[in-house]
Swiss-Prot record:
It is found in: Mitochondrion inner membrane. Keywords: Electron transport, Membrane, Mitochondrion, Mitochondrion inner membrane, NAD, Respiratory chain, Translocase, Transmembrane, Transmembrane helix, Transport, Ubiquinone. One of its GO terms (molecular function) is NADH dehydrogenase (ubiquinone) activity. It comes from the Eukaryota. This is NADH-ubiquinone oxidoreductase chain 4L. Belongs to the complex I subunit 4L family. The lineage of its organism: Eukaryota, Metazoa, Chordata, Craniata, Vertebrata.
Amino acid sequence: MTPTYMNIMLAFTISLLGMLIYRSHLMASLLCLEGMMMSLFIMTTLIALNTRSPLINIMPIILLVFAACEAAVGLALLVSISNTYGLDYIHNLNLLQC
């Protein structure tokens, strides 16, 4: 395994650990989730470049689309919670139900 792949896997692992440690705050969880998605994007891009298969070249773009949708929904929830309660705790998500 090359050092590049090890660094990307280390970045994913650190983001996953951050997600587990700061799971009560929505903003920190969203930042860790973005770090995980970016490391996955870099990994899939490197794999697509190394395999040179035309079928796998679209995979990083699909991953970026899902990451953008995840970020938009997460930020909408963050704004809704912070406007309603003034805090970014994840346990406030249950209070947004009708």
